Amino acid sequence: MKVLLGISGSSSVNLGLKLLKNLENQCELYCILTQGAKLNFKTENQANLEEICQENFKYTHFLDDKNLSLSVASGSFGIEKTIIAPCSISSLAKIHAGFADTLLMRAAAVALKERKKLILGVREMPFSTLNLEHMLKLSQMGVIIAPPIIASYSKANNLEQMENFIAGKWLDLLEIKHNLYEKWQNF
């Protein structure tokens, strides 16, 4: 299965890395890091996102967001599932408007036109009315809106457990098995 992971310029890029770590050996994985993601990661972690990815993820195909001629820009390439996590509000608005000015935005447009699974881990708080309208319209088109929200039943006691829960929920939506959090049980 071919999966595309986009990590866009929202805060909490670490959530995208957690997802990347758990996807890498489960599928044929393509990843696009936006310029905003790289800048935010450097600010939040005092580290270079591209270097960390190149050192730690050997089986992932990292793609240049500026190169719209790459394979994932075409529906014939066969990406089955696309997830943008975290997804910035700017990316959300561009996807809703059909503004495909980067490889990631073009890949999202392809997912929409090909009626493939598209998941957006929208990372913002609070949402404006305009943000909610974008999410509503995209949801009506079949896009899954999956903000990074923890649940009390996850019993998360620290940041890593919270990140595991969120990444696990995204993996559930991608239909990828994992053991990142304990599933709900009727006690």
Curated annotation (Swiss-Prot):
The catalytic activity of this protein is classed by the Enzyme Commission as 2.5.1.129
Family annotation (InterPro entries): Flavin_trans-like, Flavoprotein, UbiX-like
Task: Tell me the keywords, alphabetical order.
Answer: Flavoprotein, FMN, Prenyltransferase, Transferase
> What does the entry list as the binding residues for dimethylallyl phosphate?
153, 169
Q: Which domain of life is it from?
A: Bacteria
Entry's Pfam families? Flavoprotein
Q: Which GO terms describe its molecular function?
A: flavin prenyltransferase activity
Summarize where FMN binds, as residue positions: 9-11, 34, 88-91, 123
Q: Does the keyword Flavoprotein apply?
A: yes
Q: What class of enzyme is it?
A: transferase
Q: Which residues form a coiled coil?
A: none
Provide the reaction this enzyme catalyses: dimethylallyl phosphate + FMNH2 = prenylated FMNH2 + phosphate
What the protein does comes down to:
Flavin prenyltransferase that catalyzes the synthesis of the prenylated FMN cofactor (prenyl-FMN) for 4-hydroxy-3-polyprenylbenzoic acid decarboxylase UbiD. The prenyltransferase is metal-independent and links a dimethylallyl moiety from dimethylallyl monophosphate (DMAP) to the flavin N5 and C6 atoms of FMN.
The protein's matches in NCBIfam families, at most eight in alphabetical order, are given as: PRK06029.1, ubiX_pad
Protein family membership: Belongs to the UbiX/PAD1 family.
Its name, as the record gives it, is Flavin prenyltransferase UbiX
Origin species: Campylobacter jejuni subsp. jejuni serotype O:2 (strain ATCC 700819 / NCTC 11168)
